[in-house]
């Protein structure tokens, strides 16, 4: 039987978590990496750990690949270099709508380079037939900017991924050049596609993911990521049981439950 390993970048959000589940379901055992890069939403790392523990339980029950480990990679020193971005710079406000300042320059390239280095180490240590590096970039991340026509997040594009894969192979020994880099965007999958797959496969666990750019008790409901999360649940035709501090859509569509809001599509108490 072919042995597959995936080095999966898992942020705690629905995209990277679901895509990791997909590779587990394909029979690949996962070495999960989460990154502390000085982001404001530091709770996403703790979320990733809890989700991966549950994912491994499900994988064991279903005969999938296993979550072999979860490593936290500390690159928080990059915060001082990634200035002027909404996600790391305390002096830059997190906005409701997309703005180029939400893009952390080639953040995914940095993380994928580290993941690829680890993946090559696995190829040298183990008898592995296939090794893939995965991350959660999805089709919505590469919609064209209205002003320039280029992807909203350039390092999420299939072109970037394929170029990186080629570079990673070129930059190591010929006998090791079988490393693959994959993302939902490369497979043509959107956030709503991922939510539908996850909801149909692991059910309510998808609500435990964390999308918000901030670090509050609940999803803020105001940042671009919260708004995109809610829109994707609607596009997928799924109830959104996420707890929001403020409604990420028309207030009439949400129900106040004490100190948070939930969309009326959610029937949970």
UniProtKB/Swiss-Prot annotation:
SUPFAM superfamilies: Adenine nucleotide alpha hydrolases-like. Pathway: Purine metabolism; 7-cyano-7-deazaguanine biosynthesis. It catalyses: 7-carboxy-7-deazaguanine + NH4(+) + ATP = 7-cyano-7-deazaguanine + ADP + phosphate + H2O + H(+). GO terms for molecular function: ATP binding; ligase activity, forming carbon-nitrogen bonds; zinc ion binding. Its cofactor is Zn(2+). The keyword Nucleotide-binding applies. Binds 1 zinc ion per subunit. Its EC number is 6.3.4.20. Catalyzes the ATP-dependent conversion of 7-carboxy-7-deazaguanine (CDG) to 7-cyano-7-deazaguanine (preQ(0)). Belongs to the QueC family. PANTHER family: 7-CYANO-7-DEAZAGUANINE SYNTHASE. This is 7-cyano-7-deazaguanine synthase. The lineage of its organism: Archaea, Thermoproteota, Thermoprotei, Desulfurococcales, Desulfurococcaceae.
């Amino acid at each position: 039987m072919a042995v597959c390993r995936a080095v999966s970048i898992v942020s705690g959000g629905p995209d990277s978590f679901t895509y990791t589940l997909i590779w587990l379901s394909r029979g690949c055992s996962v070495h999960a990496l989460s990154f502390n890069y000085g982001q404001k939403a530091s709770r996403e790392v703790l979320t990733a750990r809890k989700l991966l523990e549950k994912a491994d339980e499900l994988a064991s029950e279903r005969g999938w690949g296993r979550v072999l480990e979860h490593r936290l990679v500390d690159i928080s020193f990059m915060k001082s270099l990634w200035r002027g971005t909404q996600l790391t710079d305390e002096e830059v406000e997190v906005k409701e709508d997309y703005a180029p300042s939400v893009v952390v320059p080639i953040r995914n390239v940095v993380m994928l380079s580290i993941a690829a280095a680890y993946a090559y180490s696995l190829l040298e240590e183990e008898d592995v037939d296939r090794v893939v590096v995965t991350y959660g970039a999805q089709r919505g991340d590469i919609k064209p900017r209205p002003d320039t026509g280029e992807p909203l997040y350039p390092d999420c594009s299939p072109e970037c991924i394929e170029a990186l894969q080629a570079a990673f192979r070129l930059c190591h020994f010929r006998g090791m050049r079988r490393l693959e880099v994959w993302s939902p965007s490369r497979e043509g999958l959107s956030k709503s596609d991922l939510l539908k797959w996850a909801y149909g496969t692991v059910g309510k666990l998808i609500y435990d993911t964390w999308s918000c750019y901030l670090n509050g008790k609940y999803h803020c409901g105001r940042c671009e990521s919260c708004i995109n999360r809610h829109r994707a649940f609607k596009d997928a035709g799924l109830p959104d049981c996420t707890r929001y501090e403020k409604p990420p859509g028309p207030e009439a569509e949400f129900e106040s439950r004490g100190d948070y809001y939930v969309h009326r599509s959610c029937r949970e108490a």
